[in-house]
């Protein structure tokens, strides 16, 4: 039997050293005992594998009728979302024979050459756009790109796929950033794995020294953090 998607993804995060344990200051100012570092996906093999996980999650949600079957382009917000969008569309083609465009934004408008604020598949009225991003902390990137997309064309944003849902409440409410974005914009948000799934899987996965990746000490620190900040 094939291992669950979240378990395989957790192993990938750990082996890529993208999931780190220690003490980290987040954008929110919170001190977290764990951190997801998307910068660790720094070579062709890792980013290709990451794209495969995104594609598998997308296909899973389409099959469950949670996500529109027609996706015209995958949009990744600059900068970290750019390789995600490209890798995801390549994986969708290779694994599922689905030819989908990719689009990303420029941080600054270009006034020469092809110009404009967008790169990749041009946005047109009625297109179904799927957003991809790495880890959502407060939803700031989404709130910035949605108006940008709508300013280009009357597109339908059909959803957002993340690598990890940290499942933390925002500063302003008891909702998580994911729940807050879903409520505000009305499109579904999916994650390849959430933090609870990751820690549950990490307790079972054995590292190179014969010990679980997630020790009792790490699990306790994560549990205490989520007791305080979890949504």
UniProtKB/Swiss-Prot annotation:
Keywords: Glycosyltransferase, Magnesium, Pyrimidine biosynthesis, Transferase. Catalyzes the transfer of a ribosyl phosphate group from 5-phosphoribose 1-diphosphate to orotate, leading to the formation of orotidine monophosphate (OMP). NCBIfam families: pyrE (TIGR00336). This is Orotate phosphoribosyltransferase. It comes from Bifidobacterium animalis subsp. lactis (strain AD011). Disulfide bonds: none annotated. It holds the Pfam family Pribosyltran. The keyword Transport does not apply. It comes from the Bacteria. The lineage of its organism: Bacteria, Bacillati, Actinomycetota, Actinomycetes, Bifidobacteriales. GO terms for biological process: 'de novo' pyrimidine nucleobase biosynthetic process; 'de novo' UMP biosynthetic process; pyrimidine ribonucleoside biosynthetic process. Its cofactor is Mg(2+).
């Amino acid at each position: 039997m094939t291992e669950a998607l979240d378990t395989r993804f957790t192993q990938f995060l750990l082996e890529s050293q993208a999931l780190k344990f220690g003490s980290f200051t987040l954008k929110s100012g919170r001190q977290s005992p764990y951190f997801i570092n998307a910068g660790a996906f720094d070579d062709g093999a890792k980013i290709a594998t990451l794209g495969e996980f995104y594609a598998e999650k997308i296909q899973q949600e389409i099959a469950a009728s949670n996500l529109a079957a027609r996706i015209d382009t995958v949009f990744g917000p600059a900068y970290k979302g750019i390789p995600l969008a490209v890798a995801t569309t390549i994986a969708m083609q290779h694994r599922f024979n689905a030819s989908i465009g990719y689009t990303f934004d420029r941080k600054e408008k270009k006034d020469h050459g092809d110009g404009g604020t967008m790169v990749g598949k041009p946005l047109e009225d009625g297109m179904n756009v799927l957003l991809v991003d790495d880890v959502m902390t407060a939803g700031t990137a989404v709130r910035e790109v949605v108006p940008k997309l709508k300013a280009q064309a009357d597109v339908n944003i059909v959803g957002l796929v993340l690598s990890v849902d940290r499942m933390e409440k925002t500063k302003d409410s008891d909702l998580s950033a994911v729940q807050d974005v879903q409520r505000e914009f009305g499109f579904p948000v999916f994650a390849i794995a959430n933090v609870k799934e990751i820690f549950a899987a990490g307790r079972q996965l054995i590292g190179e020294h014969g010990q679980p990746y997630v020790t009792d000490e790490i699990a306790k620190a994560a549990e205490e953090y989520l007791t305080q900040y979890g949504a």
